[in-house]
Amino acid sequence: MSKKPSKNTKRRTGKALVITIVVIVVAALIAALSPLFLPKQTADKVEGIVEKVVGMDSVVNKGYKKLLNFLKGFTKDLQAKNAPKVESARIEGLEIPAYIDGHEVVRHTGYTLSWNEQYLVADWVAYELTATELDTQEVSRSEDFRPDETVRRSSQLEDYKNSGYSRGHLAPAQDFKWSENAMSETFYLTNMVPQLQNYNGGIWLKAENATRDAARITGVVYVVTGPVLTDGPFETIGDNKVAIPKECYKALLVIDENGGVHTVAMSIPQNVGKKESLSKYLMTVDELEALTGLDFFIELEDDVENAAEATYDISYWPKSFQ
């Protein structure tokens, strides 16, 4: 006959169960609530540490993950409610960053750019991308690369010839299929930077596709994109010495249907492989501003801008950002 467990054994088992439940609850609360009080990167680190600790016990880990997923539903709702708000879901010119003294600003049909005559690349290219525009398939890719006569001094086709670098779009041609003229103007060399082909057709294309995914899901995305020009000196191509950026960036902003403002930014080095994920290069808009020396989304009210640019919520953006 098997022995019945003693009262002491039952007490020990009961205590162990209580301790296990307490550990699960505390761990899940820490991981789920940290995004409400900490910057995104710090909150991610906290969750990673907690996951390593609870992962040492399979029972605790299983219960922790179930409770964490449940709690995250509530924290996402709270984050949405606490997101900085604006009165209108559309703000005219919101995508335009602060101008740089002495730099030409050019407005084309679908985008606006700030031209850096020293480096012969744009400081930034800004445009509004909508789901409606992406659904319009009226125009095929024109491929009419050419200098931009609207600036005092443009890069030239010969600068890229046999250079080993592709003419990398900043505002992608695919985002402008809604207009033959808008599409054609994306092939101005002022909208190009020298990019390695593996980069241009690799992770940079991933960034472009992710931006389109965001526009299709949210309806409208405000986009600013360009090369990082604060980490020179730069190697150059061609007789005109077009600067080869070491990395390129994007800053994105969405205003949701309730007026909540959501931002995310990224800066991606040219030596990144095709298989790398975007998530490694995501950052806050504040961090991108510190990196580039630019000031984005200045049409927002100061308090809204400060709150929106200080953090980002990866769960708000499509899975292609991960």
What does each of the following model-derived ranges do?
Residues 2-322:
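Domain-level detector for secreted/extracellular nuclease and nuclease-toxin modules, and
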